[in-house]
């Protein structure tokens, strides 16, 4: 395991062999560097807990606390983080302070238990794509891929909340960013608790 974290808060000792920190602060864009750091930390804590579960009688896994304040970023890197979160035997509790927007929003709702500060803001919108100045075939392929990842995103969001497909589709048709506060987050089961 590397101890040189690229984007995540370095004040915590995530790789302490006796007592690794269980607080991850994601106050950055979702990109390859932040995804690498988060995946490495979650994997290390799971290995630590697996070892202790096998060797320490009545060992109980303590949750990982993931604090999120992010405008989002790369969908593919976000999906990588979510994949590791979903397969983590150690529970991951997500906390939103500030904002969880776009891919940051989907990472937040993918926590095993979710807390939202009363002043936080969530935002859902249609996946954004970079303009491509290329052949028509390439443009079509890019559109198809954007539709596919939007469908994956929406299915995850619908599975984790009480939001309805029509609400998401209406938001996309109206071409607006859908902002939600903590009260709406409770209404749609985006969060389990407001703190």
Locate predicted features.
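Terminal-region recognition feature
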Residues: 1-195
